[in-house]
Amino acid sequence: MIAEQVGAVGVQDFLAPAARLRGAGTAGLAELSDLEHADRLARMREGSLGSVHSWELVTAVDGPGTRMTVFLAGCPLRCLYCHNPDTLEMRRGEPVEADELLARIRRYRRIFQTTKGGITLSGGEVLMQPAFAGRVLRGAKEMGIHTALDTSGFLGAAATDQMLADTDLVLLDVKSGIPETYRKVTGRALQPTIDFGDRLNERGIEIWVRFVLV
């Protein structure tokens, strides 16, 4: 059901014309804004193309060491205190090739190795684009780079076993542990996040729980 939601809502939203990017931007990444809509849809579903809002190098809270944090566009939640409201709609990202993004990641491999850093896929909600995220994670692991997902966990069912096998760390953003409060804050149910957390625990994946004090 969740995977269907990603396909029916997220991908269709991606077909709209790309708007001007905000944030750090996608400097250095190829822009593919002239792709036909049908081609975008097919390539996004297979994971060779994604909608990227921006990326930046950070050393603060997105995982250990120096990180290249990639913000994907699109999110199913509507949090009252959203930190990145300009990433909510997939149409506000730019179409970016997975291979192009991996080439950019490769350029920072020595920095990641020196600082014990890596890449963090964030958003928006990274699991709105599971095929693209999975391809980037696989490519990063093949380069020996530490990987992290920054996610609400609401779309955790969309994460394949292979994707999780390629993930070293999950930054799990739990908006509230009270179902009623969670729905009030996000407009969605808490249980999918709990289920995803249980799945991560069963697989022994490192988790950093995030909780915002408002």
Question: Language-model segments: what does each one mean?
Answer:
Residues R91, P95, G123-V126:
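Short gly/ser-rich anion-binding loops that grip negatively charged ligand groups
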Residues G93-A103:
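Short cysteine/histidine-rich metal-coordination sites, predominantly Zn2+-binding motifs
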Residues V6-G7, D99, G177:
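Residue-level detector of intrinsically disordered/flexible regions characterized by low predicted structural confidence
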Residues A18-L21, E31-S33, M44-E46, E100, ...:
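Short acidic/polar alpha-helix capping motifs at helix-coil junctions
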Residues L102, R106-V214:
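Conserved AdoMet/S-adenosylmethionine-binding subsite of the radical SAM
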Residues M1-L72, R78-R92, R107-T115:
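N-terminal [4Fe-4S]-dependent radical SAM core
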